Amino acid sequence: MATIRPDDKAIDAAARHYGITLDKTARLEWPALIDGALGSYDVVDQLYADEATPPTTSREHAVPSASENPLSAWYVTTSIPPTSDGVLTGRRVAIKDNVTVAGVPMMNGSRTVEGFTPSRDATVVTRLLAAGATVAGKAVCEDLCFSGSSFTPASGPVRNPWDRQREAGGSSGGSAALVANGDVDFAIGGDQGGSIRIPAAFCGVVGHKPTFGLVPYTGAFPIERTIDHLGPITRTVHDAALMLSVIAGRDGNDPRQADSVEAGDYLSTLDSDVDGLRIGIVREGFGHAVSQPEVDDAVRAAAHSLTEIGCTVEEVNIPWHLHAFHIWNVIATDGGAYQMLDGNGYGMNAEGLYDPELMAHFASRRIQHADALSETVKLVALTGHHGITTLGGASYGKARNLVPLARAAYDTALRQFDVLVMPTLPYVASELPAKDVDRATFITKALGMIANTAPFDVTGHPSLSVPAGLVNGLPVGMMITGRHFDDATVLRVGRAFEKLRGAFPTPAERASNSAPQLSPA
């Protein structure tokens, strides 16, 4: 198997890229030298074809009609049976469409990925099937997952089941909408800047971003290796804990995971007494320029209601919370341009299981369909290219060197408190924008809500969004964040609040005025 050889034009372009001057002699000599070096590429290609290429898998799937997909939340539907019985037997799960399901088409919300069918199941898919779950389909996500709203998918906007003229949130908007609408029992979401917690908050469901590295990212399309997370989106905290118990733990294929990572016990203490736990309300998480006062008030009321069951609730200042967003922004922008775009998703320089078929497919379409990318991805491309080339990646290096300081600021507060609380989002779901909205408004509406969620992607702390109440008839999320690998306490506090609050209504119950009464907010 012969690797494609560069022609003279390609060699000239490579030389210009690196500032290398090619004289007449060099132009004659380099093709043969490069050809010799590419001999190893030929050997690797043949070895991979013989020894490591995954077998082709065929699984039935369907593209649902508009009437079958009123929220535009399904990319394709399936009915993949479990591989064994387990704790999830009889439960239906949707998989975010940046996560590979062998034999089922994948789009990742983007024309640049459209047409790809993976040959491997992601680790989380394998584990869900082994635990008895049925995979009901792939849920629509944002274009390359770089949006906190739900209007950038190439397949069209995902609609909020509470009000179909409003955003469902992103980038896991399809996952949250399907859970909220009762189409599935739970879903897999991904989170690089809040993309599990944002749609969970907008749609009135539970979303948990686990501690970084707790759940293997193997088989999901990356954005930036140091902020990639997968986690559960569910109706209840109990189901989030149950799902986490299935998908957590080291798989040996993900460089994001330390060798010591083990799944915890998230269920045995879930309903334990929370009397005496200390809750810190982070002042810097409130009063953003775009914050709705009613949302801030609802979350403060929800947090203070925990005193009714014995928790101590106090306010705390963490000034680094306001800096952490900017640290995240540099890492996500430069790192996203370097790995997600120039690195065709996976990048290099790390061990782990790669998906070379997906890398090659994306590389073949990334430039061809660049104009079809969302404005948010174009912002990453243009800003990140400047950061990498003109600034030499130094800003990325500075941001990475600041991460330990931001992490330490939260850790200091978490020595005083068991968990930290703030609004997941500064406002309730807004109306979907018009198709001809100007570029600046497009980007602001897509990314303007992530100030509280993004910091914990870069610091890696576990962070849970639970419904705190309703403002103007729309859900509000309260975010509960804890110590690294203490996901159990985060979920325990969320569960205690859930029981105190009472069952959160579904959109259908709210519409029929049969919703249960909520205690706080």
Curated annotation (Swiss-Prot):
The active site is at 96 (charge relay system), 171 (charge relay system), 195 (acyl-ester intermediate). One of its GO terms (molecular function) is amidase activity. InterPro entries: Amidase, Amidase_CS, Amidase_dom, AS_sf. Keywords: Hydrolase. It is an enzyme of class 3 (hydrolase). The keyword Repressor does not apply. Residues 155-174 are annotated as: Disordered. The keyword rRNA-binding does not apply. Pfam families: Amidase (PF01425). It comes from the Bacteria. Its EC number is 3.5.1.4. It catalyses: a monocarboxylic acid amide + H2O = a monocarboxylate + NH4(+). Hydrolyzes propionamides efficiently, and also at a lower efficiency, acetamide, acrylamide and indoleacetamide. This enzyme seems to be stereospecific and can lead to the production of a single enantiomer. Belongs to the amidase family. Homodimer. This is Amidase. It comes from Rhodococcus erythropolis. The gene is amdA.
